[in-house]
Design a protein with these regions (language model features):
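Short, contiguous acidic/charged loop-to-helix segments that flank catalytic cores in large enzymes
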Residues: 149-152, 237-241, 274, 283, ...
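Conserved "right-hand" nucleotidyltransferase catalytic core of DNA-directed polymerases
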Residues: 1-274, 289-291, 362, 375-380, ...
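Flexible loop/turn segments at secondary-structure boundaries
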Residues: 75-76, 145-146, 169-171, 258-263, ...
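Conserved catalytic core of nucleic-acid polymerases
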Residues: 18, 25, 131-161, 169-170, ...
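Function-dense linear segments that define catalytic or interfacial modules
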Residues: 250-335
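A structural signal for short, well-ordered beta-strand segments
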Residues: 297, 458-460, 501-503
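Catalytic palm subdomain of template-directed nucleic-acid polymerases
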Residues: 22-46, 305, 351-356, 460-479
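Polymerase palm active-site segment centered on the conserved acidic dipeptide of motif C
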Residues: 37-72, 364-373, 467-520
Length: 520
């Protein structure tokens, strides 16, 4: 265990509070015209994707109605099975929530042999069949009817048709399996109404799919993503604007378990990164011909894991500029873009997945032995002291950490994840923010017009006056690369892991061009 005082981390947090106050007051300028166009484009794409999806639904389900917003319907569509007894299903697979310690968590799924799992699925979730729909003869397709009273008048209230259950259509099974025929991997894929179809599960299973199933899954994930963009981000950017077209997000240091900043009104921390997210175009400079300047740490959490673990291979890879995503792609047998989602999962305790993912996680553990050994040390530390302490003095409590009968530690994923995420985004990034704020006040005379307007995970965003462009680029670079000296001053440690940053600038937050920092 590292014997450190928590005071340095506390001082850092107090100083950061002042900086965050300035960021909130400065606000972020929103272009109403850009935002309106973004909404229109999203809604067109959303409608087009919905139509494409429903054509595939009709192809694989026949006339069976499917509501894409229903987890039960999606389960039947993807896995071609429909649960006949939900209560028994939940009981067999131990689905639901329970109190563990003081926290309400999902129950751990039942462990069972593959053969037993397959048998249970066959018994409780028969294969779904395609259907043909015909108009209900009882209600003539209306779904309800009125009784004729003795007086000869029709009853005022409508009665739901029992024959068609109110839908106006009678669905008759045809002898053909419906759906996309995805096979569940085991109890971990079960959900209350069937099987999981959430984003994480579909991303994991995408490599197992082909043909129509893969096309549908890819379109559905994009459809779901755009719906989230509209309902969460576009709506929020419209809702929280003041009369001058600014939004003023609230930043919080005490919400996430790791100490990473969170924000609300709106929540910027969940916004997708980079040029793949058109809603960023709505964020513009408040100055005529002004700029949005963003500084982003490259692979910060990977480098932090190397520093905390002392892994010699990570130091070597960073020094030589190794493309770690290409290594992932090579091991998994996928393209580099697809590999990106998996590269750093082992840093956070990722060990399970499909065959390709498991192969990569195993290879990562063998390549980065220092990280693997460090993970073991963290678990032993958590079990023996009930906490993990960072070089900054920041502590994470794990009061329920114990080895179970299989040699695993309760909360092992958090034990491995919190130190990396915490030191990177709750210690290093705040150092850079505070340094930048100090430089803005002390070096620019009279006071700088440019302001810090946002921070998202390991990036810092500024609104830059056109007359201060070169100065702000220089100051942001200096602030983000000061970590070695500042970590020594604040925490008394030698942070010897090389840090690299990317600076980009443009007239809105979407259309940014990279700056060659060697020219600064």
């Amino acid at each position: 265990m590292v014997n450190k005082s928590i005071l340095p981390a506390l001082r850092l947090s107090m100083e950061l509070t002042d900086v965050l106050t300035d960021i909130e007051r400065a606000g972020i300028k929103i272009s109403k015209g850009n935002l309106s166009q973004i909404r229109e484009d999203y809604e067109k794409e959303y409608s087009s994707l919905y139509n494409d999806l429903m054509r595939i639904v009709e192809e694989v389900m026949g006339d069976t109605p499917i509501n894409l917003d229903s987890p039960d319907d999606r389960s039947m569509l993807f896995y071609s099975r429909k649960v006949s007894d939900k209560a028994e299903w939940k009981k067999i697979f131990n689905i639901g929530f329970e109190l563990r310690g003081n926290t309400k968590k999902q129950k751990r799924r039942t462990k069972m042999r593959r053969a037993d799992f397959v048998r249970a699925v066959k018994d409780l979730a028969p294969v779904a069949l395609k259907t043909v729909g015909t108009q209900c003869s009882s209600c003539r397709g209306l779904g309800s009817y009125r009784y004729r009273l003795k007086s000869g008048d029709l009853s005022k209230n409508k009665t739901k048709c029992k024959m068609c259950k109110g839908c106006g259509v009678i669905y008759t099974n045809v002898n053909q399996a419906a759906g996309l025929k995805l096979k569940p991997r085991g109890p971990e894929d079960t959900a209350a109404g069937g099987f999981k179809t959430d984003k994480e599960t579909l991303e994991q299973r995408l490599l197992d799919l082909d043909g129509t199933a893969k096309v549908f899954a890819e379109k559905y994930m994009k459809y779901s993503k755009i719906r989230t963009y509209l309902n969460t981000f576009v709506d929020s950017l419209e809702k929280f604007q003041d009369e001058k077209g600014f939004i003023h997000p609230q930043f919080m240091q005490c919400v996430t378990s790791t100490g990473r900043l969170s924000s609300r009104t709106p929540n910027f921390q969940n916004m997708p990164r980079g040029s793949t997210f058109p809603a960023r175009k709505a964020i513009v400079s408040r100055f005529n011909n002004g700029y949005i300047l963003e500084g982003d740490y490259r692979q910060l959490e990977f480098r932090v894991a190397g520093f905390l673990s002392g892994d010699a291979q990570i130091y070597e890879d960073v020094k030589n500029g190794v493309d770690v995503h290409s290594y992932t792609a090579e091991i998994m047998g996928v393209d580099r873009q697809a590999a990106k989602a998996h590269t750093f999962k082992p840093l956070y305790g990722g060990i399970l997945g499909n065959e390709k993912e498991t192969r990569y996680y195993s290879a990562f553990k063998k390549k980065y032995l220092g990280v693997a050994d460090w993970h073991e040390r963290l678990q032993r530390e958590a079990v023996s002291t009930k906490k993990v302490v960072l070089p900054s003095g920041r502590e994470y409590a794990f009061p329920y950490a114990e080895f179970n009968s299989r040699g695993n530690v309760a909360g092992s994923t958090s034990i491995k994840n919190y130190p990396v995420q915490g030191f990177a985004t709750a210690d290093i990034l705040p150092i850079a923010l505070i340094k930048l704020s100090t430089l803005l006040r002390s070096i620019i005379k009279p006071a700088a017009k440019s302001v810090i307007i946002n921070t998202v995970h390991d990036s810092i965003i500024m609104d830059v006056h056109p007359d201060e462009k070169d100065q702000m680029i220089y100051l942001l670079k200096e602030a983000m690369l000061c970590i070695k000296d500042e970590a020594h001053l604040r925490f008394g440690i030698l942070f010897d892991m090389p840090i690299d940053i990317e600076l980009k600038i443009g007239h809105d937050w979407l259309n940014l061009k990279e700056i060659d920092i060697n020219d600064i």
